[in-house]
């Protein structure tokens, strides 16, 4: 059976891995997932990720989770725009997470980026997820 929400699946794997104090989690690779992980790494929510390719043309992303004093850096990670209900915002209505302590990740015409980058570049888009 086909996966209906691949990005939501990746976020759930990260959330579950952090709850179980795993050092890393893996997920099937895609360009969107890699761009979201780029933003999470740039913002300091994960240590990094690497792409592992298999011989049959499939690839997997291995995500290294980050902890600070034994607690996960990611307290909350949630999907906002879902396959059944897409959420689009203009630059003026980009939501703040936890009064600016967290980030919102958006897919814009200029690429996948964090909320503060979208405000700087004056661009709106689809709200993919929020992280705190």
Curated annotation (Swiss-Prot):
- Coiled coil location: none
A GO CC annotation given for this chain = ribosome
User: What are the BP-aspect GO terms?
Assistant: translation
Q: What domain of life does the native source organism fall in?
A: Bacteria
Keywords of the record: Ribonucleoprotein, Ribosomal protein, RNA-binding, rRNA-binding
Question: Per its record, what are the GO molecular function terms?
Answer: rRNA binding; structural constituent of ribosome
**NCBIfam families this protein is in?**
PRK00136.1
Give the protein's biological function.
One of the primary rRNA binding proteins, it binds directly to 16S rRNA central domain where it helps coordinate assembly of the platform of the 30S subunit.
Assigned protein family? Belongs to the universal ribosomal protein uS8 family.
Give the record's subunit note: Part of the 30S ribosomal subunit. Contacts proteins S5 and S12.
User: Which HAMAP family does the record match to this protein?
Assistant: Ribosomal_uS8_B
Q: What is this protein called?
A: Small ribosomal subunit protein uS8
